[in-house]
Design a protein with these regions (language model features):
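Nucleotide-state-sensitive switch-loop elements of NTP-binding domains
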Residues: 2-112, 116-124
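Short, low-complexity, polar/charged sequence segments that are solvent-exposed and flexible
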Residues: 29-30, 59-63, 110, 132-137, ...
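Residue-level signal for alpha-helical context at structural boundaries
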Residues: 41-42, 131, 158, 180
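Phosphate/Mg2+-binding loops and adjacent switch elements
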Residues: 88-166, 170-173
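C-terminal accessory "lid"/substrate-recognition subdomains
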Residues: 151-208
Length: 208
């Protein structure tokens, strides 16, 4: 089996219409990602959002669609690598597939895994597809909740749900204006239930 130079793999998790494509398009358009070499983008499902040909050309990105989960195996992926010869790989993962069973070629190394979640539909998926959602979240370095405009009061509960599965993940909340700088009570270095709040020197930055 073909085994070439080590490749960095970036996996973007999320259910259909969660905003994965929007996130990847934004990433490809950033100067920090326009590094030497070419990128292979593997789509595991086709959403309504499309990738503009101009962006693909400008970011030196090839794109391939794999809609059959069985084709996402080390042998097939090694053949694809040999065909496209990418320097790095982005996988837009199908949230309905079993991530636990996913195996990559031996020279593919996971560089980063992120999960994108539509905050407006999170309760539905959390209630009805908890095991699939947990599999996406468990090994992700970052969880991005978008479309938070109408669910601001629910964000502390959403955060606790995520932390119950992955305590170390960074959690980002976004609305139509961008990232929400939300400070949660459990992150504060003091107890709000006490009559007197005592700040240590590390706490002053929060009030700045």
């Amino acid at each position: 089996m073909f085994a070439g130079k080590q490749k960095s793999v970036y996996i973007i998790n999320g259910f259909l219409e969660a905003g994965k494509t929007e996130f990847i398009k934004f990433t490809l358009s950033q100067d920090y990602f326009r590094i030497k070499g070419n990128t292979l983008l593997i789509l595991c499902e086709e959403g309504e959002e499309e990738y503009p040909a101009e962006l693909m050309k400008k970011s030196n990105t090839d794109m391939i669609l794999i809609e059959d989960e069985e084709q996402m195996n080390p042998i097939q992926l090694a053949v694809i690598e040999k065909t496209y010869k990418p320097d790095r790989i982005i996988i837009e993962w199908n949230g309905m597939w079993n991530f636990k069973e996913f195996k990559m070629p031996s020279n593919w190394k996971l560089a980063q895994q992120l999960t994108v979640i539509d905050a407006s539909t999170f309760p539905v998926y959390y209630t009805n597809m908890k095991s699939l959602l947990a599999e996406q979240i468990r090994n992700s370095e970052m969880i991005i909740f978008n479309r938070c405009d109408n669910v601001r009061n629910d964000l502390p509960a959403y955060r606790r749900n995520i932390k119950a599965v992955n305590q170390t993940a960074d959690i980002v909340f976004e609305d139509k204006n961008g990232e929400i700088n939300e400070i949660f009570e459990e992150d504060l270095p003091y107890d709000l239930s006490k009559d007197e709040i005592v700040l240590d020197t590390n706490a002053y930055g929060i009030w700045g």
